[in-house]
Amino acid sequence: MPLITGKTKLLGVIGDPVEHSLSPVMHNAVIDHLNLNYIYVPFAVKPEDLRTAIAGLEAIGVVGFNLTIPHKQTIIPLLSTISETAQLVGAVNTVWRTETGWSGTNTDVHGFLAPLKRLNLPWSQVSPVILGNGGAARAVVVGCYEMGCRQISVVGRTKEKLDHFYQSWQNTPIQEALRVYLWEDLPQLVSKTQLLINTTPLGMSPHIDQSPVDLTVMKKLQPGAIAYDLIYTPNPTLFLKEAQQQGAIIIDGLEMLAQQGALALSIWIKQSVPVEIMSQSLRDYLNL
């Protein structure tokens, strides 16, 4: 850990709860590696205190900060500008100081895309199937659209929530590419997709013996398809283990976490960030 002085610049993450965040681990590992005079700390902020907290961060000279649950949407009215990506996702996870106030973006889209882009596939011919229709699914939908996928299928458990999810993309070019399906349609979708993405929490502790996809359905996955789980612990999840048994290429959520963090840190410190240091710090911390 670098020596903290009167010149040390402050970064952080705000959430409720925030004690389980891995952001301080990976950001401080890179700060130490680059020998920067910064420190990254977690701030527990309740929803009703968000406005006061943001004013406080501004007053004490914080350079920038991340947001986690439940603040990714409610922060938006408190910012002077947000990026086009953040507007599409409807959530901000990274904020930095400007002359006109706070600006925000969403680095989850970049984080999600980074491991996929290395595969150099003809993405316009890939029709991803996304499990779940919550906040994480929104970043994945935007990422798939930015990658050039022409048809994006989102699978959920309740028609009302799916309809709301679909309508939320009105007046955006994404809605034309979007299809929504109920869970019972999954067998047919899995058999045809080249990219299956889990954005649900199924498979995380304490439900590590569960998968969002039944094994009978997973057996329909084509060999060589990609299975991507946004969950990073356990590593691998049951979802990824069973996909790998079908001959799938598997991607876990650890690189997405590191890549979105690296982009955020590069915005704040205005220099490139070694993603591999972030990834390794997470693997060391999680004993992976």
From Swiss-Prot:
Q: Which residues bind shikimate?
A: S21, L22, S23, T68, N93, D108, Y232
* InterPro entries named in the record: Aminoacid_DH-like_N_sf (IPR046346), NAD(P)-bd_dom_sf (IPR036291), SDH_C (IPR041121), Shikimate_DH (IPR011342), Shikimate_DH-bd_N (IPR013708), Shikimate_DH_fam (IPR022893)
- Keyword Oxidoreductase on this protein? yes
The lineage's top-level taxon is Bacteria
| Associated pathway | Metabolic intermediate biosynthesis; chorismate biosynthesis; chorismate from D-erythrose 4-phosphate and phosphoenolpyruvate: step 4/7
Q: Which GO terms describe its molecular function?
A: NADP binding; shikimate 3-dehydrogenase (NADP+) activity
Q: Name one GO cellular component term.
A: cytosol
Q: Which Gene3D superfamilies match?
A: Leucine Dehydrogenase, chain A, domain 1, NAD(P)-binding Rossmann-like Domain
Q: So what does this thing catalyse?
A: shikimate + NADP(+) = 3-dehydroshikimate + NADPH + H(+)
Q: What does this protein do?
A: Involved in the biosynthesis of the chorismate, which leads to the biosynthesis of aromatic amino acids. Catalyzes the reversible NADPH linked reduction of 3-dehydroshikimate (DHSA) to yield shikimate (SA).
Q: Per its UniProt record, what PANTHER family does this chain match? A: BIFUNCTIONAL 3-DEHYDROQUINATE DEHYDRATASE_SHIKIMATE DEHYDROGENASE, CHLOROPLASTIC (PTHR21089:SF1), SHIKIMATE DEHYDROGENASE (PTHR21089)
Q: What is this protein called?
A: Shikimate dehydrogenase (NADP(+))
- What organism does the UniProt record list as the source? Gloeothece citriformis (strain PCC 7424) (Cyanothece sp. (strain PCC 7424))
Give the taxonomic lineage as stored in the record.
Answer: Bacteria, Bacillati, Cyanobacteriota, Cyanophyceae, Oscillatoriophycideae
Q: Which gene encodes it?
A: aroE
